[in-house]
């Protein structure tokens, strides 16, 4: 996704 980081993080 565009924000893979967001998906990896709890928030």
Swiss-Prot record:
Q: What's the stated role of this polypeptide?
A: Converts (3-methyl-)-quinoline to (3-methyl-)2-oxo-1,2-dihydroquinoline.
Q: What EC class does the entry list? A: oxidoreductase
EC number(s) from the headed UniProt entry: 1.3.99.17
What is the species listed in this Swiss-Prot or TrEMBL entry?
Comamonas testosteroni (Pseudomonas testosteroni)
- Catalysed reactions, as listed in the record: quinoline + A + H2O = quinolin-2(1H)-one + AH2
Keywords in UniProt for this one? Answer: Molybdenum, Oxidoreductase
The keyword Oxidoreductase appears for this protein: yes
Its quaternary organisation is:
Heterohexamer of two alpha chains, two beta chains, and two gamma chains.
Instruction: Identify the pathway.
Output: Xenobiotic degradation; quinoline degradation
Q: Which GO terms describe its molecular function?
A: quinoline 2-oxidoreductase activity
Cofactor(s) annotated in UniProt:
Mo-molybdopterin cytosine dinucleotide
Q: What is this protein called?
A: Quinoline 2-oxidoreductase alpha chain
The cofactor note from the UniProt entry for this protein is:
Binds 1 Mo-molybdopterin cytosine dinucleotide (Mo-MCD) cofactor per subunit.
């Amino acid at each position: 996704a565009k924000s893979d980081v967001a998906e990896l993080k709890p928030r």
